[in-house]
A protein has these predicted regions:
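N-terminal low-structure segments adjacent to metalloprotease catalytic domains
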Residues: 1-147, 274-319
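Metzincin-family zinc-dependent endopeptidase catalytic domain
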Residues: 18, 46, 51, 85, ...
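Metalloprotease/metallohydrolase-associated module, dominated by Zn2+-dependent proteases
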Residues: 163-218, 234-319
Length: 319
């Protein structure tokens, strides 16, 4: 196990910058906002933690990348900044949910609401579903698990992929079902199944896992992470952060839902929200039962309670 701890001087430079204009921008934050952002610089800080690498299969040792500080982010000419006519995030579902449509549509709505709180100040809308066939995607059946997979070139699997230049991301939640890796997983195809290329009928009435609190939490993580890439946020190397890369499910599970101070400043500089307003919106999402008129379904937020307490500590520090 390895703990990656950066010197305070290095963290301060990554957060605030050495450029005079960016230092002046930083000084525009309120005292409360700076207190939260600078918690990582204090020896008694309670909000942010150093990155822990548990094994060589974790993302950082498996995929070495450069650290990307605020100044590098702000200087990137390709970073995305919302503007008039381009300030909406769209969620497009792919495939039919069949008999599970009622509850799955609620799940998509909860994701939409979370995304709108996370990217506070932007509008998030859902688009009508499209068929898998209409995407023309490549797929395969995993020879070991008999699970159906959408094929991503050069990867054996992905939780999600996003493109800054295209402003688009694709996320899959099948692996977030606790039973996905079990031998009796309900979504397995029959042994020996070999659908022909282009035969998308295999997706008809495909298994939809139950919407649990753990699945919802994992889904919120991957959505916020991949959409972050669309804004130019690269994989975080500084502190525990939702923008850290994840090479496997166990690594993803131990990561936080929150942004570290450096990535938070990057996102805030792009969107322009008040940090307290964003935290309040996220806390409201955690506390809201998520019910919809005429539908008896409570949003399963048990797995989010620790996150809710963290948000409350942030808000208390800013008062």
């Amino acid at each position: 196990m390895q703990i990656i701890e950066h010197p305070v001087k290095k963290l301060r430079a990554a957060l605030i910058s050495s450029r005079l204009d960016l230092i002046e921008r930083y000084q525009q934050y309120s005292d409360g906002e700076k207190k939260v952002l600078e918690d990582c610089l204090r020896p008694d800080g309670v909000l942010f933690r150093a990155i822990t690498v548990r094994s060589d299969s974790d993302w950082i040792p498996a995929h070495p990348e450069e650290s990307y500080d605020f100044q590098s982010f702000f200087s990137n000419p390709y970073r995305s900044t919302p503007c008039k006519g381009h300030h909406t995030i769209y969620i497009q579902t792919i495939g039919s949910f069949g008999e599970a449509a009622l509850h799955t549509n609620l799940y998509v709505e909860w994701l939409r609401q979370y995304c709108e709180a996370f990217y506070y100040g932007l509008v998030v809308k859902t688009l009508p579903p499209v068929t898998v066939q209409s995407t023309g995607c490549t797929f395969r059946v995993n020879s070991c698990s008999n699970n159906l997979q959408l094929y991503a070139e050069s990867w054996n699997f992905v939780f999600g992929q996003a493109s800054l230049t295209e402003g688009m991301g694709v996320f899959s939640f099948a692996r977030y079902d606790d039973n996905f890796y079990q031998r009796n997983y309900a979504g397995q195809l029959k042994k020996g199944s070999k659908p022909k290329p282009g035969d998308y009928s295999v997706f008809n009435n495909y298994y939809i896992p139950p919407i649990t609190s753990t699945l919802l939490l994992r889904s919120c993580k991957v959505v916020s992470h991949e959409v972050g890439h669309m804004f130019g946020l690269q994989h975080c190397q500084w502190l525990q952060c939702v923008m850290q890369g994840s090479n496997h499910l166990e690594e993803s599970d131990r990561g936080p839902l929150s942004l570290c101070p450096i990535c938070l400043r990057k996102l805030q500089s792009s969107i322009g929200f008040k940090i307290a307003d964003r935290y309040k919106a996220l806390l409201q999402w955690v506390h809201d039962d998520g019910g919809s008129a005429g539908v008896h379904a409570v949003k399963p937020t048990e797995a989010f309670q620790e996150y809710g307490q963290w948000l409350q500590r942030c808000l208390a520090m800013m008062e």
